[in-house]
Amino acid sequence: MELFTTFQSDRCVVRIKDASEDRKNERRRRIATEAAKQCRRSLVPEVSAAVSFEKAIDLATESDLCLFCYEGEGTLPLGEILRSCDTLPRSVSIVIGSEGGFSEAEAEAAKAKGAVMTGLGKRILRTETASGFVLACLVMISEL
């Protein structure tokens, strides 16, 4: 993981406020640094300032593979997507929604920009759990 970005989506309950965002980002940076030390990683992921949904999708779709985690119709299982790759792409972006998930309009916008719609199984995962789940799947595929 190289970059962690928060963004505002339609169904997000928490609204980003400039006053508290700096403090939250500093906390996220400390967590990223401690996690990197614990895992003996030389690279500490960058924690960027919050961006709009549109900017987040623009950034995410610059990678070789953009996985848009969506619980709606028309998704492919994550395992199927990863098995279809001969080799794991050099750069992968993972877009995970807030506690309210994504609206259909957001999913359509991401798909139009080239994101691959993926599901994470039958259960709806919490945001924190979903990110760890997807990262673990990517690490498993890349290290086998």
Give a label for each model feature.
Residues S9-D10, G74, S98, S131:
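A generic "binding-loop/recognition-motif" signal
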Residues I16, P77-G79, T127-S131:
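Short, charged, surface-exposed secondary-structure boundary motifs
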Residues S48, Y70, E99, R123, ...:
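Glycine- and other small-residue-rich loops at beta-strand/loop junctions that grip anionic moieties
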Residues E104-L144:
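Structured adenosyl-cofactor binding patch, chiefly the S-adenosyl-L-methionine
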Residues M1-L67:
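RNA substrate-binding interface of SAM-dependent RNA methyltransferases
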Residues E21-N25, C85, A136-C137:
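Short, hinge-like loop/turn segments at secondary-structure boundaries
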Residues S52-I57, G74-L76, L125:
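A short acidic, often aromatic-flanked loop/helix-cap motif at beta-alpha or helix-coil junctions
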Residues S63-G101, A105-E106, A115-G119:
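Active-site/ligand-binding-proximal alpha/beta "capping" segment
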